[in-house]
Amino acid sequence: MTNTIVISCLHNMAAILYCGQIQKLVVANAHYQVSDIYLGCVDKIFSGINAAFINLGKNEYSGFIHISDTGPLKKKYYVNNITNILTIRQKILVQIIKEPTLNKGPRLTANITLSGRYIVLMPFSQSICISRKIYDEDERHYLKSLAILIKPATMGLLFRPSAVGVDEEIILSELKNLKEQWNFVQKSAINSYSPVLLYKDEDIVKKVIRDFYNNNTNNIVIDSNLGLKQLNYYIHTWHCNNSSTVPKIKLYSNNQCILDAFGINQAISRALIPKVDLILGGYMFIETLEAFTIIDVNSGSFNNSTSARETVLKTNCSAATEIAYQLQIRNITGVIIIDFIDMESQRDQLQLLEHFNKELSLDDAKPQIVQLSELGLVELTRRRQGKSLYELISSDSNYFYFFTQSERSQSLKRFDDRQQKQQIFNKSWLSAEINTINKVFFQKSNLCRPANFYLIRNLYIVKSSITYKQNYLLTHRSKLIYSKEYSKVLPSSYYLASLNKNSNQEFLS
């Protein structure tokens, strides 16, 4: 299967394309990312649930750690009360294993690990682990023997699937780098005051090549000269160019935004719409709630089969294929309940589940079908791997940058023309909105620039960065503009009037 990696250093995100279709989005630089290492401070302890909240020094949420994740801190294995392990204001070295959701903070562990392309260093473990994705028994025996020889005495090693067939010198070189990283973390922890961030994997190029590059990668496109140098460095360091197929690396230099050129913005836009049309004519609705996600499948106008039974089966199989794709592109995790079109035949139900299992097997997040309930609902779970697309856009103003630099993102133009015409743009109506926008979008200097805003579900979205040559810009929705002179968002009527006379001084005051 052909594989193309598109990296946008400007937007700090990347996309993995299979046969021209976007399968996965990769984003870096979140407030809390998996594998970030903090020197935290114990804030609260709840002995009833054997858990504690750790102050990480920023944002609104504290991290959550359970007693089962405090292994290195236990002086004795049989300790079963967290109050015997942690005390208030105690310093603790922790790592994020689950990113925060809209209402919960990040999940933490004291079992620190450092990941490379081929191996994972486990400083607080002495075990040797081989990835389950390595099926060759001879290769597993070889890697285990190699680990016994090279493993540090007080640390453990885990071999990733990419370690198959790799020369020992390359693995030794990576082990050396990981040990140096761990030494750096330890020294930083000793010399720092908690709470503080000690280690963060912010390099989008490194993250993509380490976690997603494989022998099927044929093309890599990147939009930055500096990023291109980093890309060549990591490919050379990890000896990715020694594989049977050497990928073609291209620097993207067209005027069109790279996210538009490869359809990434369009894919994100479509993934924000609850309704998804099926190829055969049916459709489905995807609604994500706090507890679970609901998917409802409908046949719509599809009626190209000889019988109603065949129509239902084809529609359900088409929906199963699309659901497997939508779970990946939207990064929907947790409990998922699917209401397929009712089928009376158990043979058809079995055929649908077999087809659905086959489609889900291509997903790295390992979705598992739990059961087909008596009501005909398919229940499955999907392992959490970072934030969902909806969470990225809803929870963090930095992720409004998802849509920056794109002046033709079609989904952000879905407005109700009738309501727009009826909207009254006066000083009293706009005052609260303007204050909110200024507070949300211009609290950080890197966002203080002329910008477009769009209203989606009562949420303002930044559409694009505009050239610094323009002093103001009318928006399509609210008729608001950003004034460089006053560093505020103002109603267009007030600002345009100020070009001829100072009629907006009363409003600014």
Curated annotation (Swiss-Prot):
Gene Ontology molecular function: any one: endonuclease activity
Q: Kindly list the cofactors needed.
A: Mg(2+)
Q: Which UniProt keywords apply?
A: Chloroplast, Endonuclease, Hydrolase, Magnesium, Metal-binding, mRNA processing, Nuclease, Plastid, RNA-binding
Q: What main location does UniProt list? A: plastid
- State any GO BP term from the record: mRNA processing
Question: Which note does the record give on the cofactor?
Answer: Binds 1 Mg(2+) ion per subunit.
Listed EC numbers: 3.1.26.-
GO CC terms for this protein?
chloroplast stroma
**Which residues participate in Mg(2+) binding?**
D296, D339
Q: Tell me where in or outside the cell this protein is found.
A: Plastid, Chloroplast stroma
Enzyme class, broadest EC rank: hydrolase
**Pfam families assigned to the protein according to its UniProt record, in alphabetical order:** RNase_E_G
* Superkingdom field: Eukaryota
Where does the S1 motif domain start and stop, copy by copy?
35-117
Function text: Involved in intercistronic processing of primary transcripts from chloroplast operons. The endonucleolytic activity of the enzyme depends on the number of phosphates at the 5' end, is inhibited by structured RNA, and preferentially cleaves A/U-rich sequences.
- Similarity comment: Belongs to the RNase E/G family.
Q: What is this protein called?
A: Ribonuclease E/G-like protein
Name the source organism: Pyropia yezoensis (Susabi-nori)
Gene that encodes it: rne
